[in-house]
Amino acid sequence: MRKTILLPVMWVTALPLGDIASPPLVAATNEPFALARRQMVAEQLSGPGRNITNAGVLAAMGRVPRHEFVPKPLRSMAYQDRPLPIGNGQTISQPYIVAFMTEQLEPKPTDRVLEVGTGSGYQAAVLAEMTAEVYTMEIIEELAQRAAADLKRLGYTNVHVRAGDGYRGWAEAAPFDAVIVTCAPEHVPQPLVDQLKEGGRMVIPIGRIWNQELVLLRKRGGKLEQHAVLPVSFVPMTGQAQEQPEGRSPKAAGTPKPEPGRMQR
């Protein structure tokens, strides 16, 4: 079912109750959460002890209204550096992990990006501020429908939402310049590799729960160059990912040990 805008030890937790686009008109300087959003960027992303330096990422995070992607009772906490529940056992990632993964992806204004794990739609909105087209997949249909409605309401016309199993990717919209995955399979899904352009980038958490690495992949000469960024813990990828034999993963070159780190989703 295709719906076009109808619709990160870093520890990740699931809490109970998760052509170039013009910026939407939702980030007016006089809207009530604008100050909180500016403080989030200055203190949580680029402040002391933080390492987000990509100006495009910081600008996008300063425009996207995170409070619009969390349940109304939690909006007062929307700009705290923490994950928040969004229903269906899922969370919206803490702002820092969104910024970190986006920076690792190196998005460009002409990119067409695939996101696996729409969740609230917040990550897709950040990517939409920086790229030409975002195709995002969510296996929980209720979340996909809600995210699509919110993204449409906020003016993100370059985001396309599909309810379905992200393990398979979005073949008819491929190839993609970049792929970002916000749930953890035990290996890199081959369909996502096949749908990645030559020279394309992928950011994905890989491994079993409590033993995962955030990995940056680049496709060169039909092969994957792999760099482990740091240990993470994300919610497992469900669907077809859970049906795959152990050890199946596309061949990758270079798998250095990651440095220790911590993060939440």
Q: Can you say where each PLM-predicted feature lies in the sequence?
A:
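Bacterial N-terminal signal peptides
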Residues: 7-19
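Class I SAM-dependent transferase core
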Residues: 24-114, 125, 130, 145, ...
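Positively charged n-region of N-terminal signal peptides that target proteins for export
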Residues: 1-4
